[in-house]
Amino acid sequence: MYSANKIEDEELAAKLPEPVGYKILIAMPEMSEKTEGGVFVPDALKKQEETASIIGYVIKAGSEAYSDIDKFPSGPYCKEGDFIIFRSYSGTRFKVMGREFRLINDDTVEGVVEDPRGYSRA
């Protein structure tokens, strides 16, 4: 249900907030218009999936993200440019120029995926 969208619009990138502390700024992939089987996804379902989304693209991390050695003894879970899986409904949601972003805590990241296409909430 997700598409692999990265931030390529320079005007949009310039308007994004700088994450502070332990926060990670992520871009939310846009929802596909159709399922893998070719069925169109209704707008209400797309909105529900966007709200409960579990996949994001890491734009930038705050200066203190993953700095707690006791909590992250093996280092950061993710880096800029990674697609991540995070807890549903987590983070502060906001839109810039019609595109959704979130600020999440560093310990909310649960996994890294190479390509978000083909993933959906269970």
Give the location of each predicted region:
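Compact, glycine-rich, soluble single-domain proteins
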Residues: 1-122
